[in-house]
């Protein structure tokens, strides 16, 4: 099963573009994503619809932690996302819908995401693919955290889904 080492943080860092350029990170483009999270345990289950053309069902499991968030995941392509969404919504329920614009970069064996999430703000996320061992993944994540000056107070321990649900529950 594939594994990533992940870190997600709030950002308003104006120097992100300069850091990406200095690292020579490869720009893979902008993707509009709608993630529909379903009521599911263990782990999380979401249907990701991208740029109105590609979709995939993703299951993942990871701890809510500041440090060493390893995520085990499985994903499959989906040809008819609307039908699958209707079936899952009817059978197990929808937990939240997260809409975002994601700029994706690649640096070594890490994906760097700059996410503009509807109603939440801007975030940076590192997904280090654990393909060269855990020590290398931890070292690369630490390097990226320093390079982008990610402070501990800005690190998120939950998913966008949890943040959206908290926002919905706040009294107006």
Language model regions located:
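Conserved, surface-exposed functional patches that form binding/active-site neighborhoods
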Residues: 96-132
